[in-house]
Amino acid sequence: MKLENFYVKDDASTDESYGCYPTKRPMEEYIRKGLVCIDKPMGPSSHEVVVWVRRILNVSKTGHAGTLDPRVTGVLPIFIENATKMVKFLQESSKEYVCLMRLHGDAKREDVEKVMKLFVGRIYQRPPLKSAVKKVLRIREIYEMELLEMEGRDVLFRVVTESGTYIRKLCRDIGEVLGTGAHMQELRRTRTGKFGEDMCYTLQDLLDAYVFWKEEGEEKYLREIIKPMEVAAAELPKIVIKDSAVDAICHGANLSVRGVAYVEKNVKKDSTVAIFTLKNELVAIGRALMDAEDIYRLKKGIAADIQRVMMERGVYPKVWKSSSD
C-alpha cells in the first residue's frame, strides 16, 4: 500500500492482539480464506476442476470466477470457503485471451488487421447457440486486439475483453466482415482481472504441496500456491478503517466517515470499494457514497454502503454503540 495514493484521515494504529496479517494466518485458516489460480487443462469442465480442488484441499466449498469451456485452457481462479464471497466481484473483471482463428479463405495480413481494428470498442453480440444463457443481443466492449502471428489461413491473436464476451462468436464475426468466414480453432485465457498465467499452478502442483504439508509439516509450497483472498480485491479502490470500526461492519453496519483511517484517492461516489483493516485484512466490499475528498474532509456521514461482509464477527472487539450517525 503506497501511502501517497491515500488521504490520511486519521493516522491510527492497530492492536496486535486482534486479527491477523493475511500472510501470517495459521495454515487451516489461510486455506479457508484463500484462492488458487489453476492452469485449466483441455478436457475437463470448469466445474470438474473446481470439484477436484475441493477434494484435494478437503474443504466444503469452492467457487470459480469465469467459466471456461472444456476445450479452453488457461487461467481459472478458484476461491475457497470464506473467499467464495469474492467470486461475484472477480467475475466482472476484464479477461485476456490468446486465440487461434482459422479463416475459411485466403486473406492478406493487413486486411485482417484492418478488420480487427473495427472490432475494438463497443460491439453487439448474441450468445452462440450452444451457450446456456438467453439468446438476447448484448453490448460488450473489446479493449484491445492484436494480431500476433499469421501463417496461411491460421491467425493467432491476443484480445482483451469485457467479461461475458464470446470469443467464438467474435471469430465468426471477424470472418464475416473479412468476407472469408472464420472459426475459433483454439483458445487460451491468459488473464482474468489481475490474475495472469504467471500466478497459475497445475492441479498436480496443488496436490503435491498439500500432501507435503500434511505429511511433512512443510507449509512453504502450499502458501506459494494459495493466495490470501485479499489479493482478489487488489484492483478495487480501498478504504482502510480503524480497529474500532471493524466489528460494527461485521454486524451489518454501514461505514461511517468517523471509522475511516485512510481512503484511496481514486475512490469515487457509487464505485465498488474494498474495505480493509490496518493489518490489510479484507473486512467487506461496499459501494462508496462519497468521493474520496468528501470522506477525507467530512466529520459526519456514511462513507460506504456495505454489500458483502467478508470477515467473521468477533475478530475485533465490540467498541461501538447502536445509534444513528
UniProtKB/Swiss-Prot annotation:
Residues annotated as catalytic: 69 (nucleophile)
Any one GO molecular function term: RNA binding
PUA domain ranges (all copies): 236-311
Keywords carried by this UniProt record: Isomerase, tRNA processing
Enzyme Commission number: 5.4.99.25
Broad enzyme group: isomerase
Annotated catalysed reactions: uridine(55) in tRNA = pseudouridine(55) in tRNA
InterPro entries: Dyskerin-like, PsdUridine_synth_cat_dom_sf, PsdUridine_synth_N, PUA, PUA-like_sf, PUA_sf, tRNA_PsdUridine_synth_B_fam, TruB_arch
Any one biological process term the GO annotation gives: tRNA pseudouridine synthesis
Family, as annotated: Belongs to the pseudouridine synthase TruB family. Type 2 subfamily.
Function, in words: Could be responsible for synthesis of pseudouridine from uracil-55 in the psi GC loop of transfer RNAs.
Protein name: Probable tRNA pseudouridine synthase B
Originating organism: Archaeoglobus fulgidus (strain ATCC 49558 / DSM 4304 / JCM 9628 / NBRC 100126 / VC-16)
Annotated gene: truB
